[in-house]
Amino acid sequence: MIDLIVSQGRVADRAAWMIEGAARTARALEERYGLKGHYVGEPAPHADDDWSVALPQARETLVAVREAATESIKGDNLTVLVNNTCSVSLATLPVVAREHPDAVVLYIDGHGDFNTPETTDTGYLGGMVLSGACGLWDSGHGAGLRPEQAVLVGSRDIDEGERELIRKAGVRVIPPGEATAQAVLDAVKDAPVWIHIDWDVLEPGSIPADYTVPDGMLPAQIRAVFEAIPAERLIGVELAELNAPADSERAEQAVAVILDMVAPAFDAAAARP
């Protein structure tokens, strides 16, 4: 079975249609798998604000997501979160680290998200998510993820200072061209697996996403990862950052691509009693 948690509160959104993107994805999953999502947070307008403003604004949503994720992760179902932004993972990754201390987090993202308040050039909260979960700075929402538990997959747009932090911390990186199913299996070994995906990991044009960069992964590579991870070892999945097109047909096409990528794992989870 699948527990579906959907973030609908603003969490550092800088683009207008991220919350709608999460809602569209969730509705499609509900229809495909007969689910009833747990919707968290109240939508608010996007803003180009600094992390120091966005983080306290998002507190209520992050706390609610953490509580919902904790309840699900302690159970037997596959935990699935559909998030408007990667910043929501500030609430979830510490829970994963606490409840599954031997888990490997596959952080599938075009960026490293390993900046800190001291290194960020943009002030964007979403660029500091993995570093916060690893305790390099205090988000107020917990930490506990050991850097060696994290594997950056498909990451290629990494700031110079951020790259040094990644190197010193010991976070593993699998570039897009090397992100095969076998490479991922070699990285996770026999550990439980948590998958975080920001759709900007894909080659631009595959899925409408914010902060896209060239030379990305292809949808077939993402699907291959879901096919390769044994169902009994997959403990949770986060899907983030669909910047939903205003045109309904294009939005539906994007969601269809997403559902095809995750189908191997979600079909297996839905079939479990």
From Swiss-Prot:
Reported consequences of knocking out the gene: Cells lacking this gene do not produce cycloserine (DCS).
EC number of the protein: 3.5.3.25
Entry superkingdom: Bacteria
Enzyme class name: hydrolase
Protein residues bound to Mn(2+) 2: D109, H111, D198, D200
A Gene Ontology biological process term: arginine catabolic process to ornithine
PROSITE patterns: ARGINASE_2
CDD domains from the UniProt entry: Arginase-like_1
GO molecular function annotation: arginase activity; hydrolase activity, acting on carbon-nitrogen (but not peptide) bonds, in linear amidines; manganese ion binding
Reactions it catalyzes: N(omega)-hydroxy-L-arginine + H2O = hydroxyurea + L-ornithine
Annotated keywords: Antibiotic biosynthesis, Hydrolase, Manganese, Metal-binding
Gene3D superfamilies: Ureohydrolase domain
Cofactor(s) demanded: Mn(2+)
Protein name stated in the entry: N(omega)-hydroxy-L-arginine amidinohydrolase
Lineage: Bacteria, Bacillati, Actinomycetota, Actinomycetes, Kitasatosporales
Gene of this entry: dcsB
